[in-house]
Amino acid sequence: MAEWHKIIEDISKNNKFEDAAIVDYKTTKNVLAAIPNRTFAKINPGEVIPLITNHNILKPLIGQKFCIVYTNSLMDENTYAMELLTGYAPVSPIVIARTHTALIFLMGKPTTSRRDVYRTCRDHATRVRATGN
């Protein structure tokens, strides 16, 4: 879908963010669009399934790297987002937002606030949800 690549392009132009990817969670659970050669481009189906099925997950593996869950409301229909921190130095904020068909992964730089990452990821997810995807 061309819309996914447009979201990744918009994010990659912004200097506040380090990595971004969009992953299908309904059918194939594969990466649909991502910034090339980064952590989120390596996300595999085995890492996506625990995110959407296990509400009490504490240290998920994302792109073969451990992360620490800060808040988890990913499957909540009103919030549809999960906040994480990287489990390695330098610590960066990560937000995963859920649309009807995909998960939007967004990692900020270590100097970017969690609020900026959360707001940007939720805005993209809300826009996509409004179109029905």
Curated annotation (Swiss-Prot):
Disulfide-linked positions: none
Name of a matching Pfam family: Profilin
PROSITE patterns: PROFILIN
Keywords: Actin-binding
An annotated Gene Ontology molecular function: actin binding
Family classification: Belongs to the profilin family.
Function per UniProt: More likely to influence phosphoinositide metabolism than actin assembly.
Protein name: Profilin
Organism ancestry: Viruses, Varidnaviria, Bamfordvirae, Nucleocytoviricota, Pokkesviricetes
